[in-house]
Amino acid sequence: MAISGVIGEMGAIGLIGLIGLIGVTARHPIQAPMPTRPEAFFLPSDAAVGGQRFCLYHPPAVTPARGFVVYVHPFAEEMNKSRRMAALQSRAFAAAGFAVLQIDLLGCGDSSGDFGDATWAAWVQDIVQGCRWVLAEAALNSDDAAQAPLWLWGLRAGCLLAVEAAAQVDTAVNLLLWQPPASGKPLLQQFLRLKMAGDLLGGQAKGITETLRQQLADGHRVEIAGYSLSAAVAMGLDGAKLTNAPGVPAKKIRRIEWLEVSTREDASLSPISATTIAQWQSAGTTVRNQVINGPAFWQTTEIEEAPLLLAASVNAISEQEAQ
């Protein structure tokens, strides 16, 4: 999507007046917040691949900022499907007093490179650099920046990247996870099946998933749904797990807000989500979870919104940690 398209999404934020500061508790009074204008820029990359990363920075509506948020977008076409929700949520966070950075990772959106040039490790490095940038920007504007929490906010595969990046960030972080998978393996399998679905029309689907996996294992790129998938990204996604990295203290990730959406009124966490949460809790990390009514906007045919998720997310990161 061109820069004009991204900023165009920014302009149609009719929900912000509705959700405003819904749920922000009296313990966090915000004095007459004024709408902020997002700032688009290119961040020179520190990664070996180099180039620039397109960023959109949302200044907080109040100073000092109540916290800092770095958004980690999902994988492939899910990124495009979720752009509107990411824009709405970023503006809502900024209105609630949080500084927000949206960054297009290597080969994605308006950043340098092609999707096929990306590696999982380079994506993690992009996120780490984004965190350093937003904290440095905050330090320029407030002496209290070090006291405010840093949040990594991921969606789907972005949750897996956020967990890996958290281990490399210079400070302790909190995680806001939207529809987090327990591992990347099913996400890769789902993506490979897009190729199988296309080949079904030509009668060539037999064994296609196994063939694609072998090509990736041999270090080759594969073309799926208009994306050139590199072996480095595929293997990184396939091996990613939503667990703390070995050797990283549990206190490095202080708190996790785990939010899922479902169109079912009686929806609850899946067994694998419950198990993953229990593993984090047993390691000493505070985890709170909610299942919220709303559509799977990252995969719907038409662009959709989940207003209840927007409000729940503002509430979640606005809560003070237990002392």
Language model region names:
Residues W151-A162, Q179:
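Gly/Ala-rich beta-loop-alpha elbow adjacent to hydrolase catalytic centers
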Residues C108-N141, A146:
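Catalytic nucleophile-loop/oxyanion-hole region of alpha/beta-hydrolase
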Residues P60-D104:
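Short, surface-exposed "cap/lid" segments of acyl-processing enzymes
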